[in-house]
Regions:
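ATP-dependent adenylation/nucleotidyltransferase module used to activate substrates
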Residues: 1-118, 188-190
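Peripheral terminal appendages
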Residues: 25, 68, 85, 89-98, ...
Length: 192
């Protein structure tokens, strides 16, 4: 509901370009709204961003189980945003069953822009499309969370049930046609 089709199309175009430099990647669109709402209504606002990212990691791990991926890969860049500080990345990593690889972690903005221009993703990444990440963003994000504090917040939530609810609203997106195949249909479990 908060991810416009134009954003899915933009990400699909970028994924197609990236597939020229890697094995054939797949695009999964996960609806985090159930988790975001519960976090917004239940947890301290300053921890929202880290909690959202931990849910993304938990869901990505479930998708990785199905695709047999041995690691997760992100475009995180140290210090770029509140969730990408060393303390917060460590807390986010703790939610993962797999290594999280961050090839851009030490790049500065100019390096990242130069790389994007070289591989052909710069123009596409500049497209102005509303982003779903800002809908529930806190005004006071914590830049130095601890695992203990985050686990206290998560204790207020039914994390496994929320992950399942988000997965039930996840789909694999065909990069060319944008056709969506629901998670339950992919996994043979329509009642995820």
């Amino acid at each position: 509901p908060y991810t416009p089709p134009a954003l899915i199309a933009k990400v699909a175009r970028l994924a197609e370009v990236l597939n020229d430099f890697q094995g054939k990647g797949q695009l999964f669109a996960a609806n985090l709204l159930p988790a975001q709402r519960m976090i917004r209504d239940t947890c301290r606002s300053r921890y929202r961003t880290v909690l959202y990212r931990r849910f993304m990691v938990l869901i990505a791990n479930r998708i990785a189980d199905w695709t047999t991926a041995s690691a997760l890969l992100t475009g995180d860049n140290l210090g770029q945003v509140a969730s990408q500080t060393l303390p917060n990345m460590a807390v986010i990593d703790a939610a993962s069953e797999r290594m999280i690889i961050r090839p851009l972690v030490a790049y500065d903005k100019q390096d990242t822009v130069a790389l994007a221009a070289r591989i052909g993703t710069l123009e596409g990444s500049k497209e102005e499309v509303p982003d779903s990440c800002t809908v529930f963003a806190p005004t006071d994000p914590c830049t130095s969370s601890t695992l203990r504090a985050i686990e206290r917040e998560e204790a207020r939530l039914d994390v496994p049930a929320l992950v399942e609810e988000c997965l039930a609203q996840t789909a694999r997106v065909d990069l060319r046609t944008l056709a969506e195949t629901p998670w339950g249909q992919l996994t043979g479990n329509d009642a995820v």
